[in-house]
Each structure stands twice: as structure tokens, then as C-alpha cells.
Regions:
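An N-terminal-biased, well-structured beta-alpha scaffold segment characteristic
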Residues: 1-78, 211-213, 234
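Rossmann-like adenosine-cofactor binding region
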Residues: 39-44, 162, 166-259, 274
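Phosphate-binding beta-alpha-beta segment of Rossmann-like dinucleotide-binding domains, i.e.
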Residues: 79-137
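Oxidoreductase and adenylate-handling cofactor-binding alpha/beta cores
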Residues: 87-106, 155-159, 284-298
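Glycine-rich Rossmann-fold phosphate-binding loop(s) that bind the pyrophosphate
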Residues: 143-144
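N-terminal Rossmann-fold NAD(P) dinucleotide-binding loop
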Residues: 147-148
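Adenosine-phosphate binding glycine-rich loop
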Residues: 260-299
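Conserved small/polar residues in nucleotide/adenosyl-binding loops
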Residues: 301-306
Length: 306
């Protein structure tokens, strides 16, 4: 009998994939496996019984990989399980940045006492006019599960799409639309694209990859979208550039004091995978990974301290 412990609420449709050989434990102590979403595990005392940690999500920044490796604990994640949910939010982010939809909605709310609001709206709507994304250039940095979906969807929306990923997998390459133009130098995306969306993991080599130097290469009307990891962008440099009118908008799914309320910043409260479908898919995949490891020794989608 295996014991598993959930550090966060895990979708029941996922837990239903455990059979009678698995029992949920109310305590971490004595657990053979742990399921986690966003709970911070750094500094947590890991029991000697623990064999596996499965993150119901793609990133593993909240898991102490070095400590797990030292104790022989295998860490799994669920890449691609929430990809469609994130893709849809990225597309929404592009539209929110292109047309002042949010500003228009707030104006309507503020004028709710106007008995002739329809006529007033006709006079005021010019204040919320924007641009269309069709025909614009989109640069996708990172062509993993999410990046490929974003690139393909943008093609169908009439955009001219450029993709950069020196480490693209065979699977991703097969799934990528032939209409996406391959870029070998990321600086070409910074210089040429109207929209730039980042979909790379957070590593020492990618931390603050979108820095002041990169921002200085961008067009004055550039819109940067970050639904991957907050530390991929030097947000202080980004806010300075927005204030100076050097680029148009920054859309992020990671609220913090630097960006919230700053000119040109559109910030959502980490909604990327916050859909019922994404949570279900991640939970199902995480449970199946644990079972496959416990029962068969399979090590698909593991993460390590490197």
C-alpha cells in the first residue's frame, strides 16, 4: 500500500486514477509520494519515506530540486497539460493590449447612471480605439508545448509569426505550422516584431533575458507578453521603457509591486492555468506519473537539480 499526500487541493478527476493500492495521507510524514501545485516546498523537511514529488503544472521553482536529488526523490512535472489554457490567455493578452477593452469596460461601469449612455458611448468610443492583430508580426521565443500552440493559433488569426528556439524538440517541430518562420537570432525578433511573447523555462541563462539592452532594440509600438515566468523579464527596465514611451505595452501574468499600476502594464493574477480543464489535465497526468514510477519505475517528465 502506497501513501500519498496532497500539499494543495488536487482535482478529484485526477485522484480517481489511483487504485486500491494507494491511500491518501493527511500528513506528509510517512508519505511515499507528494502531489503539489503552488505550495512552497523550500525549507520543508522531507520524510525519508518520500520517493516521488509530482507537480501538477509545468514549473518546478517551488520544489527544492537539489534536496530531492540528494535524498533520491524523483520530481515529476506535467508539461503541456495546461498548454491550451495558457495559450488562450496569451491570445487574450494580445487583444487586451491592442484594443483598450478593459478601459472601455471601466468607462461603461463608471457612467452607469447616464440615462442616455448609448449616445454618450458613441461620442466616447474613440478614446478606446485600438489596432487589429491581423497582419502584425508576432515573435514567439520558446517553441515548447505552449509556444507552438500560440504560434499556430496566431497564424490562423492572420498574424505573420516568427519562432525562435535553438532547442526545439522533434515533437514540437512536427506540430509547428509550416507558416511559422524560423529565426536563428533572438535579436531579430526584438527588432522586427510588433508582439513578442516568451515561453521558455526559468534558468540561469534565461533569467532577465528581456533586459534593457533587448528592450532598446524593440519598436516603439512593441507589445511584450510574459506568461511564462516573471524573472524572465527585467521588469524595472521594462517599466522605465514604458514610462519613456520606448515601447507600447507589457502584459504579464505575475503581479508584483514593480508592475502593478505602472503605465503601460496589463497584469493578470497568475491565471495562466486557472481553468477547470487545465487543473483536471494536470492532476490526471501527475497521478499517472506517480503510478508509472511506483509500479514500473518509469521516469517520464522528470526534473533534476541541473
Amino acid at each position: 500500500m502506497f501513501q500519498y499526500h496532497c500539499l494543495n487541493p488536487i482535482a478529484g478527476v485526477g485522484l480517481a486514477n489511483f487504485n486500491e493500492n494507494y491511500q491518501q495521507s493527511e500528513s506528509l510524514e510517512g508519505a511515499d509520494a507528494v502531489l503539489v501545485r503552488s505550495a512552497a516546498m523550500h525549507g520543508m523537511e522531507l520524510p525519508k519515506s518520500l520517493l516521488a514529488v509530482a507537480r501538477a503544472g509545468a514549473g518546478v521553482n517551488n520544489i527544492p530540486l537539489a534536496d530531492c536529488a540528494e535524498q533520491g526523490i524523483v520530481v515529476f512535472n506535467t508539461p503541456g497539460a495546461n498548454a491550451n489554457g495558457v495559450k488562450e490567455l496569451v491570445l487574450a493578452g494580445m487583444l487586451l493590449a491592442s484594443r483598450d477593452i478593459a478601459g472601455g469596460i471601466e468607462w461603461v461601469k463608471s457612467d452607469k447612471e447616464d440615462g442616455d449612455i448609448a449616445k454618450t458611448a458613441e461620442k466616447q468610443k474613440k478614446n478606446f480605439a485600438g489596432t487589429e492583430i491581423s497582419g502584425k508580426k508576432l515573435g514567439v521565443i520558446g517553441l515548447g508545448a505552449i509556444g507552438v500552440l500560440v504560434a499556430n493559433a496566431a497564424i490562423h488569426m492572420g498574424m505573420d509569426v516568427y519562432g525562435y528556439d535553438p532547442y526545439i524538440s522533434v515533437s514540437a517541430a512536427w506540430n509547428l505550422s509550416r507558416s511559422v518562420k524560423h529565426i536563428s537570432n533572438v535579436e531579430d525578433i526584438y527588432r522586427e516584431c510588433d508582439y513578442i511573447t516568451i515561453h521558455v523555462p526559468l534558468l540561469d541563462s534565461t533569467k532577465k533575458m528581456v533586459n534593457a539592452e533587448a528592450i532598446a532594440m524593440m519598436k516603439p509600438n512593441a507589445i511584450v507578453l510574459n506568461f511564462a515566468r516573471d524573472l524572465l523579464v527585467d521588469e524595472e527596465a521594462m517599466v522605465e521603457a514604458l514610462a519613456a514611451g520606448k515601447i507600447k505595452k507589457y502584459v504579464s501574468d505575475f503581479p508584483n509591486p514593480t508592475t502593478v499600476g505602472a503605465k503601460g502594464c496589463i497584469v493578470t493574477p497568475h491565471l495562466g492555468a486557472s481553468t477547470a480543464e487545465s487543473e483536471d489535465n494536470c492532476a490526471i497526468m501527475a497521478v499517472r506519473e506517480i503510478r508509472d514510477y511506483m509500479e514500473n519505475g518509469c521516469l517520464l517528465y522528470t526534473s533534476d537539480a541541473a
